[in-house]
Amino acid sequence: MRLVVIGVNHKTAPVALRERLALVGDEVSIALAQLQGFSDGSVIVSTCNRTEIYALVPESILSPHTLLPNSASAVVETSVIESSMTANNSANLSSTIISAHILKIKTWLAGFKQLSLDEIDPYLYVHRNTHALTHWLRVAAGLDSMILGEPQILGQIKRAVHMAQDQKALSNQLGWIVDQVFAAAKRVRNETQVGAQAVSLSYAAAKLVTQIFDDLPSRTLLVVAAGEMNRLVATHIAGLGVGRVIICNRNPERAEALAAELRNPNRRIEVRTLQELPQVLAEADIVSSCSGSMDILIDKTMTLRALKSRRYQPMLMIDLAVPRDIDSTVSRIDDVYLYSVDDLQHVIAGNIEQRRQAAVDAELLVSQLVVEMDRRFQVRQVGKDIQQYRTRTHEQVNKLLQASIAELHGDSANPEDIMIELTRRLTQNLTHAPSKLMRKAAREGDNELLDFVVSGLQDAHRNH
């Protein structure tokens, strides 16, 4: 397959090195352009937790002149290639060629980021062929993420692929592999529970909303305080399709900034002061609060008044603050569902364990899917090999035919002799390769190969 992946992630390298190896902004497009000089297509995935180069390496042998300079390892690699060529061992030679390409990409990456190979090599991991395919699928499915099963990585890979397409760095063959990886990752997520449960506070809060309310466009979300945690929660809940959002905050500028983030043609956004909280509480179906205040902002009395005003329609209250913003006694009120940060953490802990259990099934499915993808790749590759074989055969036959036609135009041409000679040459030409292969198999005692070739030739004769 000649697919390789070279990279670092949160498991292999400290954040200080990951920062130095991260490719940001125009670096990705520049890197993709440079990689085209020694790869048959590449994709670069660079996030806060990983920098990875996925590349198809060429089949050609690297000469000493094409290896990067100033690398003692490159000189060693060249000598290994030469010894493999002498040994005439095709399997070892192919492996050595891939190793040489891997070394070149490593050396290039170090130079591109103005680091030495010795600095980064201990932290780099390398996978090749089906192992590279397995790694790519595990990454795309969220099985290699810091948060097991998280879905963002698939979107990040898709953006990386689009960047490669824009830079003309995605070859047809690599594009085919990418399509296979995306389809397989979708199956892993659909057929296992590895990403089904929320494992962050914001996702857990959003999950609660969908469990209690199903007509979200008609619901109102009240955001009490516009800090970072509440911003994440509000973003996730609003993204579910909530039709109206009210933001109460001491600092009007921060409230307006959050309002700008959440603004949507299908969503009403209102900014209020904290002093208006008792009045707007009655309008809220969902409340998310995280103020950092030392005092209770929503007590039992205020909640009872709000419920009465809304004719006791259910309310979901999410209190992410420590100390609490919402009095714990509110949980005793009928029609109010109150969840504290501890409640959500408990839910998350259970969900993480469920994801770990689901990951076992996901890993088994990944192994199965990689086998299927590799078989499809081999079938696809054999199709190309067959086409090339037929093209070469046609060229050889046509060459012999043209020579015979030229002889027919001679003054002393005997058509019968020319036709006999043509058939002899065609027979010799077409049987040379299988005859040579059978003799080689017999000499080496490879009875399995010998039986395969003989059986194939006999089938060919029966079919004609």
Swiss-Prot record:
EC number: 1.2.1.70
UniProt keyword NADP present: yes
Listed InterPro entries: 4pyrrol_synth_GluRdtase, 4pyrrol_synth_GluRdtase_dimer, 4pyrrol_synth_GluRdtase_N, GluRdtase_dimer_dom_sf, GluRdtase_N_sf, NAD(P)-bd_dom_sf, Shikm_DH/Glu-tRNA_Rdtase
Entry binding sites for substrate: 47-50, 145, 150-152, 156
Keyword NADP assigned: yes
Xref: Pfam families: GlutR_dimer, GlutR_N, Shikimate_DH
UniProt keyword annotations, A-Z: NADP, Oxidoreductase, Porphyrin biosynthesis
Source superkingdom: Bacteria
Active site feature: 48 (nucleophile)
NCBIfam families hit by this protein: hemA
Note: During catalysis, the active site Cys acts as a nucleophile attacking the alpha-carbonyl group of tRNA-bound glutamate with the formation of a thioester intermediate between enzyme and glutamate, and the concomitant release of tRNA(Glu). The thioester intermediate is finally reduced by direct hydride transfer from NADPH, to form the product GSA.
Record text about domains: Possesses an unusual extended V-shaped dimeric structure with each monomer consisting of three distinct domains arranged along a curved 'spinal' alpha-helix. The N-terminal catalytic domain specifically recognizes the glutamate moiety of the substrate. The second domain is the NADPH-binding domain, and the third C-terminal domain is responsible for dimerization.
Protein name: Glutamyl-tRNA reductase
